[in-house]
């Protein structure tokens, strides 16, 4: 998986040591829960579906793009599932506010369970999302 030009990530994505715990293997929630742990960031093992992460009690949520946060897409937002939404990990935030996310099981991109890919959003798009700050 190639990192898009002009963006960078702080740690290679290997998925080694990722656990299933309460999130099914290969789902977006499984990926973000484990990717955050690689940076010492904790999320509750019961955050719910992707769109539910933005509404989990006890977590700071902002519309300001934040590096190493979880970005919680509401149903149909940015191609998220209409019922469950989607969640991804913010790898990079540019000075202009555009973001690079990594994600797993984003079926619309032709990928599926356990498959990781990247997407870029412009600053204008990124301002419409919920960023959940881990602990």
Segment roles from a protein language model:
Residues 1-95, 99-104:
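Secreted/periplasmic proteins that engage bacterial cell-wall peptidoglycan
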Residues 93-135:
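Aromatic- and glycine-rich peptidoglycan recognition patches
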């Amino acid at each position: 998986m190639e990192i898009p030009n002009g963006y960078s990530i702080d740690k290679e994505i290997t998925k080694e040591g990722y656990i299933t715990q309460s999130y099914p293997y290969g789902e977006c929630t499984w990926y973000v829960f484990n990717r955050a742990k690689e940076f010492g960031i904790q999320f509750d093992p019961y955050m719910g579906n992707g769109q539910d992460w933005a509404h989990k009690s006890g977590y700071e949520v902002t519309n300001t793009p934040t590096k190493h946060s979880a970005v919680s897409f509401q149903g149909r937002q940015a191609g998220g599932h209409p019922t469950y939404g989607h969640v991804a990990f913010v790898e990079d935030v540019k000075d202009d506010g555009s973001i690079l996310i990594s994600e797993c099981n984003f079926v619309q991109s032709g990928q599926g369970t356990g498959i990781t890919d990247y997407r870029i959003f412009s600053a204008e798009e990124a301002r419409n999302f919920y960023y959940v700050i881990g602990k």
